Amino acid sequence: MPRKILAVDDEKHIVKLVQVNLERQGYEVITAYDGKEALQKVEAEHPDLVVLDVMMPYMDGFEVLQNLRRNPSTRDIPVIMLTAKAQDADVFKGWQSGVDCYLTKPFNPMELVSFVKRIFKSIEDSGDGGSKIYDVST
């Protein structure tokens, strides 16, 4: 059974770009277009990883991430932030909120794929699906 990834961004062309590139690698990709929808999809679909934008309507990506980290059933889901917010303060806020990887837009889709693969490999290598330390170094 393929790993399931939730791609969340209010820009549909970004979601499509993420979806196409991850599906080419054999992942199942589900989508959401705002923060509230993202939390609903996490509860309903139980993804193995979330690719999350920051600037979205209704609830921003930092709020989504904080909600995921507070919930015992979702706190260990790896989250990759994919955002145009590249200021040091934004990146730091992401790390403080519990993000596992922070990529800025514009992004190279193959770099995203590489980070996804490295996170899943780290989980498999650890033998503990709940591990929160992922080696995504290159």
Give residue ranges: language-model regions.
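C-terminal output helix
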Residues: 107-117
